């Protein structure tokens, strides 16, 4: 997978190109990340990349010419088929379903804004989609871009050593992940659930599914409401709910 990034702070992306799962993917050639800095496309001695907004008001916008030139350079490097994404609070909220959708693209160009944002006409003429990672304000689009890269790259075949890791992650099936345990078997008086030490794969599978359903019901009930549960899932969830209610009587 090829990902181009437009950013005034390309050095920030070393965090994902040199470390962790994404760093290994880059080193193995499964993931290629290239950055373009609009500052490199300026024509004045001060290398200006911000400009005043029409209508006044606080803050500045990214200057149109350097930004557009950087996007054009990334598009030329990408060739045909690259989808341009602007990381924006006004965009579609990123979910695991959205990550799966984005992962079907072989080429992405991510535009990380700064200041108060970018000219609306640049969005209209250069951007294919806007995406947001949540309803809060950040100083720029770099962290959202890195979040998107990390999430999408996990779905690229071969990036994870065990593809089951991606398939069993939280949200992959619309549910939160089940609890995890490792050694020691007893920690400060708290034991690993018997189901996980039983050695019975079916018992373990059902326990994990029940915990996943129950945790989603308790912490993100809106996710449960949006799912069409199977008979087994409904039965396990009902069992979990009874256990919780019995424990507080």
From Swiss-Prot:
Binding site for S-adenosyl-L-methionine: 113, 133-138
Compartments, record wording: Cytoplasm
GO molecular function terms noted in the UniProt entry: tRNA (guanine(37)-N1)-methyltransferase activity
GO cellular component, one term: cytosol
Enzyme class: transferase
Reactions this protein catalyses: guanosine(37) in tRNA + S-adenosyl-L-methionine = N(1)-methylguanosine(37) in tRNA + S-adenosyl-L-homocysteine + H(+)
Protein name as catalogued: tRNA (guanine-N(1)-)-methyltransferase
Biological classification of the source: Bacteria, Pseudomonadati, Pseudomonadota, Gammaproteobacteria, Aeromonadales
Primary gene name: trmD
């Amino acid at each position: 997978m090829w990902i181009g990034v437009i950013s005034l702070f390309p050095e920030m992306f070393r965090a994902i190109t040199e470390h962790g799962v994404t760093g290994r993917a880059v080193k193995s050639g499964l993931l290629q990340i290239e950055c373009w800095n609009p500052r490199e496309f300026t024509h004045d001695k001060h290398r200006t990349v911000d400009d005043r907004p029409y209508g006044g008001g606080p803050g500045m916008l990214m200057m149109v010419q350097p930004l557009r030139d950087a996007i054009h350079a990334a598009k030329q490097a990408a060739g045909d088929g690259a989808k341009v994404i602007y990381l924006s609070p006004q965009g579609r909220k990123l979910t695991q379903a959205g990550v799966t959708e984005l992962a079907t693209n072989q080429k992405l160009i991510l535009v990380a804004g700064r200041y108060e944002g970018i000219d609306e006409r640049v969005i209209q003429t250069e951007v294919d989609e806007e995406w947001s990672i949540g309803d809060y304000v950040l100083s720029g689009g770099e962290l959202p871009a890195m979040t998107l890269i990390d999430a999408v790259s996990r779905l690229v075949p071969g990036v994870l050593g065990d593809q089951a890791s991606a398939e069993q992650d939280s949200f992959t099936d619309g549910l939160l992940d089940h609890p995890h345990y490792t050694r020691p078997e007893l920690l400060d008086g708290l034991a690993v659930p018997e189901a996980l030490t039983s050695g019975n794969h079916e018992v373990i599978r059902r326990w994990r599914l029940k915990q996943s359903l129950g945790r989603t019901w308790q912490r993100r009930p809106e996710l449960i409401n949006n799912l069409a549960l199977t008979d087994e899932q409904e039965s396990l969830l009902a069992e979990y709910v009874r256990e919780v209610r019995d424990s507080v009587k």
